[in-house]
Design a protein with these regions (language model features):
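Core segments of cupin and vicinal oxygen chelate
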Residues: 2, 9-51
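Short amphipathic alpha-helices within nucleic acid-binding modules
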Residues: 21, 80-86
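Vicinal oxygen chelate
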Residues: 32, 75, 84-135
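Exposed loop/turn and edge beta-strand positions of beta-sandwich/beta-sheet ligand-binding modules
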Residues: 37-39, 69, 107
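Short, charged/polar surface micro-motifs in flexible loops or helix N-caps
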Residues: 47-51, 60-61, 78-82
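N-terminal beta-strand motif that seeds the catalytic metal site of vicinal oxygen chelate
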Residues: 1-17, 70-73, 124-135
């Protein structure tokens, strides 16, 4: 049986652009691991134990195919409008303005942005998110 979720890995081309993006979301650098042909930068949110692994394959220039199986990662944010303003300063715009999914105000407002490699990130306003329990 699995005992602990360790990390989620995404492959990135431009580590500096990716670091700027994730740091704008509030992620902090936690570590780095180097190999001959690749290196990983580990990031996490200040009050969260989950880790995001950004993997750079040295010498790769072409964009990664995100594929049709991946949909998104989700993070809660304490000030969605403020975060979107900071991201806009970097030229990052949401797919569409914040909204309540399906008109469900009990869930709160969300929106989606894409990181520099096209990975979609769901931003959930309000700072907390309980796993939905619809019957």
């Amino acid at each position: 049986m699995a005992t602990r979720f360790v990390h989620t890995c995404v492959r990135v081309r431009d580590i500096e652009a990716s670091l700027r993006f994730y740091e704008a979301l509030g992620y902090e650098r936690r570590g780095k691991l180097r190999f001959e042909t690749a290196y990983n930068v580990y990031m996490g949110l200040p009050e969260d134990g989950d880790t995001l692994e950004l993997t750079v394959n040295v010498g790769r220039e072409e964009r990664y195919d995100v594929g049709d199986g991946y949909n998104h990662m989700a993070v809660t944010v304490d000030d969605l409008d403020g975060l979107l303003a900071r991201l806009a300063e970097q030229g990052i715009q949401p797919e569409k303005p914040p909204y309540a999914p399906g008109g469900r105000e009990d869930i709160g407002r969300i929106c989606f942005v894409a990181d520099p490699d096209g990975y979609r990130i769901e931003l959930i306003d309000g700072g907390s998110f309980a796993t939905p329990q619809d019957d």
